[in-house]
Amino acid sequence: SSVLEIDSNPIALAASRKNLGLHFQNQNFSAEEFSQMKTDGFDALSKLESDNQRYDFVILDPPAFAKRKKQTKAALNAYTKLAQAGAKVTKKGGILFAASCSVHVQTANFYKAVFAGIHSAGRGYEEISRTGHAKDHPLTFREGEYLKGVFCKIT
């Protein structure tokens, strides 16, 4: 098995590599087992698709697309496009996980955007589960509900 991590932030990539070393101190991973790409996620997914790369498990966890309420519509369009790109590189029977930390994107609208993206990729899906805040992260106001995610089996 192998991991390909894509991030445009070099600090995030360095932290990930450091974390890998902390958890697997006695294991040296080859470039085939663990690799990183410092690039925009949309660009990377487009290239991977054109290179005919397909994966068993794809995680889409971008930074917040809507930091202001007026960015909500653009954010939903971006989540749809990201899910479409992710679905195109997920193998049939593979798992696609899409997440959002955008406070201004309502949970139901996020899920609709993800599902629309999967369909626009010409793929079907079976929803496995939805995620949100853990019990140790209590919600006392609607704006606090910003973490959301969905696992889908791509068909």
Task: List the model feature ranges, each with a label.
Residues S2-D7:
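Conserved SAM-binding motif I beta-strand of class I
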Residues S8, L48-E49, K70-A74, F141:
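Short, solvent-exposed loop/turn segments at secondary-structure boundaries
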Residues I11-I59:
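S-adenosyl-L-methionine
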Residues A12-L13, A44-L45, A66-R68, H104-T107, ...:
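Flexible loop/turn segments at secondary-structure boundaries
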Residues K38, Y55-A85:
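Mobile active-site "lid"/loop adjacent to the S-adenosyl-L-methionine
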Residues E49, T80-A87, F115:
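A structural alpha-helix within SAM-dependent methyltransferase catalytic domains
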Residues K81, I95-T155:
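C-terminal catalytic and target-recognition region of SAM-dependent MTase-like enzymes
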Residues T90-K92:
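Helix-to-beta-strand junctions that scaffold the AdoMet/dcAdoMet cofactor pocket
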